């Protein structure tokens, strides 16, 4: 009995075809590099020819495996080592001069290169994520590039952000400490935003930043000792980006106002002394460059939110007048300008219109504030004549009619007495 292993049959004369995927994978990074460099050199400055070469070559080279090498060469002309140094810089046969970093430093040329990346990524969709990672990596390498190379990368990034090839979150690399400390992040951001705005507009840029929650991080482009609105505004305005300066100031003001409102609500609920609230608000105004017009409206909102109002119309007016009489000295401190007084009158009008139980309270609140020196005769007359809002204007103008007539008569009497003297 034969106990040995039975030999398996052997096929002869049969050739096995290597799958395309396996064919691609046999390429080493150096072979891949040489093929791409040669293709770029042959295309020269003809970017249409380059785009065509990349399209065709993707069917035989493994772009998926060597995506970082591909993008390194297209942007820097060579494979890059960590930090941004060129691996093959000594061997000119392994480097191409036909890349983004060696292109002319103008928007039109860089936009043409951006179109090459657009076509490539549309053709090979799987490269999308790899390209995002490449740009994030290159941003971290900025220190290793020349100023001109940084500028071209900034312009390319701006154009690609504008056309949607890159998502805004890739910009988080710019918040790296070593880039921020040396001023590279802020300088890069200015050039990038200019290219982005040139493709779209400032509103598109600020909208994209908001959606990516990057609007709150813009100050982090600067070192800690310069992370304030004043420095940001000066830097970006001088760079010709006033739209972004205004945007940041608005965002910071909104954020500050929310925090201020929250703190005021807390202090009012604890019934803190008015003088302490005044000191706190003045400090916040100075620290955050808040204008009186913004603060007076905020105070009114906080005061009206601090009370559980009676649902009966005949009782709520008395309740409101008692509450507002107590806090009139607080409002008076922050209504020293005609514009602030007008803002307050409009806020009162809006509140009384939106809260039906207060419809009949409007004129009584205004008279109370007039007597407490919160609003002046001039502000009331201005509101009455042409500065009132549309909301419930007929009702409120009718309520104020007798008081306005009284003010006018008092003024006329005062003038006639002056003439007699």
Curated annotation (Swiss-Prot):
Region (Disordered), start-end ranges: 1-24
A GO CC annotation given for this chain: cytoplasm
InterPro entries: ARM-type_fold, eIF5-mimic_regulator, W2_BZW1/2, W2_domain
GO biological process, one term: regulation of translational initiation
Subcellular location: Cytoplasm
Residue ranges of every copy of the W2 domain listed in the record: 250-417
A Pfam family it matches: W2
Family: Belongs to the BZW family.
Entry function: Translation initiation regulator which may repress non-AUG initiated translation and repeat-associated non-AUG (RAN) initiated translation by acting as a competitive inhibitor of eukaryotic translation initiation factor 5 (EIF5) function.
Protein name, entry field: eIF5-mimic protein 1
Organism in which the protein naturally occurs: Danio rerio (Zebrafish)
Gene: bzw2
